[in-house]
Amino acid sequence: MASDIDQKDVDYAAKNLKLTTSLVANKPKDCPPEAPWGACYRVEINLENTGSKSLNENVEIYFSSIHRTLGSKSEEFKVEHINGDLHKITTTEKFKGLKGGKTKSFQVDFMNWIVSNSDFMPNYYVASEHLEGRNILNTVPIDAVHITEEVSGFTTGIKHTPNQLKRTANDLLPAATATTRYEQYSKVKDLGADAVSAHILPTPLETSVHEGSLNIAQGINIVSDALPADQVEALNFRFETLGVNTGTGVPVNVTIKADSSKKSGSYTLDVTSSGIRIVGVDKAGAFYGVQSLAGLVTVGKDTINQVSINDEPRLDYRGMHMDVSRNFHSKELVFRFLDQMAAYKMNKFHFHLADDEGWRLEINGLPELTQVGAHRCHDVEQNKCMMPQLGSGAELPNNGSGYYTREDYKEILAYASARNIQVIPSMDMPGHSLAAVKSMEARYRKFMAEGDVVKAEMYLLSDPNDTTQYYSIQHYQDNTINPCMESSFVFMDKVIDEINKLHKEGGQPLTDYHIGADETAGAWGDSPECRKMFVAPESGVKNAKDINGYFINRISHILDAKGLTLGAWNDGLSHKALDASSLAGNPPKAWVWGTMFWGGVDQYNSFANKGYDVVVTPPDAYYFDMPYENDPEERGYYWATRFNDTKKVFSFMPENVPANVEWMTDRMGAKISATTGEKTHDFLGVQGALWSETIRTDAQVEYMVLPRMIAVAERGWHKASWEEEHKEGITYTSNVDGHEGTTHLNDNIATRDADWAHFSNILGYKEMPKLDKAGITYRLPVLGAVIKNNILDVVTEFHGVAIQYSLDGKTWHKYDDTKKPQVSTKALVRSVSTNGRTGRAVEVLAK
């Protein structure tokens, strides 16, 4: 750029520019011909110079867009894609200046569509050449859980009109409104607090409720030599959080009695007038028995029901995945996350610590991984940080920056162990590895400058002579580790060794290591290092398509030599040569994430039949970065499904994936079909997953995960009577939302809905007050309501949650269903927690 710009010009622009955006339309009539499937959307950007000086023409504005630009419609402004979601606005030779007090507007096209306000990424920033970047002040997000409020400083968001709410003409899904929610939630009966007081989540195998109750006003005292001290401490913390004293009061006798006929984690719990007795078949069972005792507690009550429970887990693996790479989240959040996992008997924590956007774990001997790879700021050379992504902005600190020290990680391991949770670390490779690649390139440059070629090349992950051109699914062009270089395996061996040491020091020996294994289509083809392998018969690699299989096989031997089991996403294991028996070591684990409508239905059984231990992780049911409902005011991506509400999570039958098609549609609401194939092996378990691209704060994590996580815990622990058994050769077709399909599930739908009513009543009356006591910012239900005959009628998704209404948007009143208020025109309604936190308010209009 020209030399007539300095840091003062950048600072002035960031301070005095007011940048706002608005959606013009999804799929305008003149989409550029290069738009994939002819789909694009158009955004208007307004630049207002609120200062007195003219804007320097050499100032550049950077911003994040998860969809790649198709170009500007303006003659004065150019918009170009940089890498990932990072884009840049520059002026053209036709730019006529932007004087103080003036505004310029222009329109930009992007690929695909936009129907959630979380697609509007914050922290536009100003920069030029190697000057320091500065965030444009009005685009800095407001600290809020609700997305529309968070981005309200710079975007008007998506309007409730067809050309903005609908992605294409084939989008059949109705928008969520107060009326549609009313119609849905009115079908769920309010059972009342007394009816669910003796019931817990996840649902036990057998529960007998007896007459009478046990007073625990003085507290409970866990008496056990069977449980280690750290687990007793964790359990006491659970009770104290719920307001129950520990170390005094009613004795809780906990013992272990081995029984080989029962599953690990099985237990019995007896609450009688004389005391409490828990017998586990092992330490896990004893621990879960005490958690079930906590489940009997109703916040604010001094008594629990007298019951007898005989219980065992349905599936061995009951997990949650948390991505801290896209946006970093605090150690304290991880602790709270583990607390809630333990409360609902989840036992596997899939900890996603490295991806394109960040490396989050300190690795001894490789400081660049956290010095560079753990931070995002404006550094074109990427010697001190990664370039901004996902609206992280130019300035430090930000939500895209941070990492766990070695001591932090060991604390997390100890905290998880005390809650009977295994931590499964995941560093994504060879794809999704930009942070690692750029960190090692920075290391390379540092040692080359010192003249130490051996050190420089020791851990290098990229071939500097590779001219391959590709785009990853997130629009990166350089995010893939090169498996044709020996230094890549030296790096991975080093990382795995260091993580292995951390687990030993943290008291939880490493057994499973998740390598991600995502493949970047189109990578490596023009790498000279790879071309050497293509002509070497002993390599077994004939072309670029064989490289990922070679990589997986080689990593399996590295892990096996260390006594570790390989885990990976199923797409990375899809190479034709990669049956489980072809890989070294124990049967590998495959986390299968096929969607219902992209042919993913068949992948679950297919990988199990190949000998993999399958963890069921369907995006269109168990991905919690998807919105709760079809409303632009709900945060989340929607590439797999337009919404995953709690009932949908609850209803998903994990052991017969094709059968779910009968009550589901594709992401546009169209009919889908699936046929059950051969299934020779049972699945290992289930996992909910949180990817954090749109989730910047700890509170937003809790909002997106809970209460949906409890529904995954329910399906992982308890097999419901209404779940369809797997039978080969049965075809299922959508029979919902106006589609006439198969009716295999008809007899079970009413039973499922009654079970949902029971589950949701327990959530509202018992579990949400417990989450309040724990300080969890879970999603309060958005209400359904209508005004009929001048009477306001309001319903909630979870009975037991308090409701408020307002006639002026300022004064709020408690809603009493027995004395429904008179309203002539409109009202606002919202839910409110037991500790005074309020849910998203919605407007209700009289018909």
UniProtKB/Swiss-Prot annotation:
EC number: 3.2.1.52
Active site, UniProt feature: 519 (proton donor)
Record InterPro entries: Beta_hexosaminidase_sua/sub (IPR025705), CBM2/CBM3_carb-bd_dom_sf (IPR008965), CBM2_carb-bd_dom_sf (IPR012291), CHB/HEX_N_dom (IPR004866), CHB_C_dom (IPR004867), Glyco_hydro_20_cat (IPR015883), Glycoside_hydrolase_SF (IPR017853), Hex-like_dom2 (IPR029018)
Name of the molecule in the record: Beta-hexosaminidase
GO cellular component: membrane
GO molecular function: beta-N-acetylhexosaminidase activity; polysaccharide binding
GO biological process: chitin catabolic process; glycosaminoglycan metabolic process; polysaccharide catabolic process
Gene (name only): hex
UniProt enzyme class: hydrolase
SUPFAM superfamilies to which the protein is assigned, alphabetical: (Trans)glycosidases (SSF51445), beta-N-acetylhexosaminidase-like domain (SSF55545), Carbohydrate-binding domain (SSF49384), E set domains (SSF81296)
Catalysed reaction, written as an equation: Hydrolysis of terminal non-reducing N-acetyl-D-hexosamine residues in N-acetyl-beta-D-hexosaminides
Listed CDD domains: E_set_Chitobiase_C, GH20_Sm-chitobiase-like
Physiological role: Hydrolysis of terminal, non-reducing N-acetyl-beta-D-glucosamine residues in chitobiose and higher analogs, and in glycoproteins.
